[in-house]
Every structure is written in structure tokens, then in C-alpha cells.
A protein has these predicted regions:
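Short, conserved catalytic or interaction motifs in soluble domains
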Residues: 62, 83, 161, 195-196
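Protein kinase catalytic-loop region centered on the HRD/HxD motif
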Residues: 154-165
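Catalytic-loop of the protein kinase fold
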Residues: 164-178
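Regulatory activation segment
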Residues: 183, 196-208
Length: 208
């Protein structure tokens, strides 16, 4: 049932919604290394395979350091964005579980909270703008360059002026290109979560 819901969301027949951790785990083959398509200091991105297409699953690391209110506020922002030059948001997962750990040399257990926070987006197969800037052999025609620049500007205008969302980390790595070389802005919400988690870590453990 969960798989069918995500398929309908990908097809545009349903709105983005809460997705189960088991679903995202299954479509990425238990977040296998072979499905990893990107990573940074904040999240690892996996390719999720569906019968009707592919998705990108961002698994946030150190989820315990993410402010819950901020996470849901960012999800709410993502749910309200729909623009051809912004990567399409498909859903989120906020799973919290308990695990029992036996104390060594004792029959007693301690219980730890296990958090999983994930975001699901459309899969963009043509890579980032950075790849084309760094590789001269890919040489883009002037008209293509112009359309990419215009698309980025239109996407930013939608975020900044219409949604009052500021990217804070715009760079070629965060501009993805689809098969028609249409630019798609990504990671605008994650940059704010990352800054918050860094602040929380510094407050708890001191600046390194």
C-alpha cells in the first residue's frame, strides 16, 4: 500500500505525504552502498527504485541533533513549493523507535531512542551543474547556458519572492539538470537544518 501511494505521488496523482521508514528502506535496498548517489556532512542520498520510476531519498545523519520543530517547519515549506525549476518534493519520514541494549555483565537493559529523519524527492539523472562547469569536454552551447541561467533565476524568484524561502547555500552542486537540461534547485531547506544542527552541536559539545 505504501509503495502504491509513493507511485501515485511520483505520477502526480497524489500530494506529498508522510512515508514509512520501511518503504524507504526497501526501495533503497536497505540504504545499500550501491544505491548511494551523493553525500555530504549532513545527509546521504540514495536512489530509490519504484516500478514506475526512481526517486532520491535523503537520509539525515545525526537526526538526534535536529530540532523537531524546525524539521517539521521545513517539511511544511517543502509541501507548499511547486515550480519547474525546483526539485519536486515527494514526501518525508519522521520515525522514532526504541531499542533495548543489554548492559554488559548484567541482565538489565538500557533503552535508547532511535530517530530516522528522511526526505524524498524526484530523481534527477543528469547530475549537477558543477559537473558541467568542471568538465570542459561537456561544453554547453550558449543557448543552453542562457536557459540554465534563466531557469535558476526563475526558481530563486519563486522561492524568495513568492514563498519567502532563502536558499543560504546556492552553488553549482545544488543545481541539478534533468534530461532536457532544465535546472532544478535543491537543498534549500536542508541548508537551514544543517546550520541549526551545527549550532546545537557547538552548544552541547563546544566548538571544535
Amino acid at each position: 500500500m505504501d509503495l502504491e501511494v509513493l507511485q501515485r505521488i511520483l505520477d502526480g496523482r497524489e500530494k506529498p505525504t508522510n512515508l514509512s521508514f520501511e518503504l524507504l528502506k526497501n526501495i533503497t535496498e536497505n540504504f545499500s552502498h550501491d544505491r548511494e548517489i551523493g553525500h555530504g556532512g549532513f545527509a546521504t542520498v540514495y536512489k530509490g527504485v519504484l516500478p514506475n520510476g526512481n526517486v532520491a531519498v535523503k537520509r539525515i545523519r545525526n537526526s538526534h541533533s535536529i530540532n523537531e520543530a524546525l524539521f517539521y517547519r521545513e517539511v511544511d515549506s517543502l509541501l507548499n513549493i511547486e515550480h519547474k525549476n525546483v526539485v519536486r518534493f515527494l514526501g518525508f519520514c519522521a520515525s522514532t523507535d526504541q531499542t533495548a541494549i543489554q548492559i554488559e555483565g548484567s541482565k538489565q537493559h538500557i533503552y535508547a531512542e532511535v530517530r530516522e529523519r528522511l526526505l524524498c524527492f524526484e530523481y534527477i539523472s543528469n547530475g549537477s551543474l558543477q559537473k558541467y562547469i568542471a568538465d570542459e569536454l561537456r561544453g554547453l552551447e550558449w543557448n543552453t547556458r542562457y536557459e540554465i541561467i534563466r531557469g535558476i533565476c526563475e526558481g530563486l524568484h519563486h522561492l524568495h519572492k513568492e514563498k519567502q524561502i532563502y536558499h543560504m547555500d546556492l552553488k553549482p552542486d545544488n543545481i541539478l539538470l534533468d534530461n532536457d537540461m532544465v535546472p532544478k534547485i535543491t537543498d534549500f531547506g536542508l541548508s537551514r537544518l544543517d546550520e541549526k544542527s551545527k549550532t546545537m552541536s557547538e552548544e552541547r559539545y563546544g566548538s571544535l
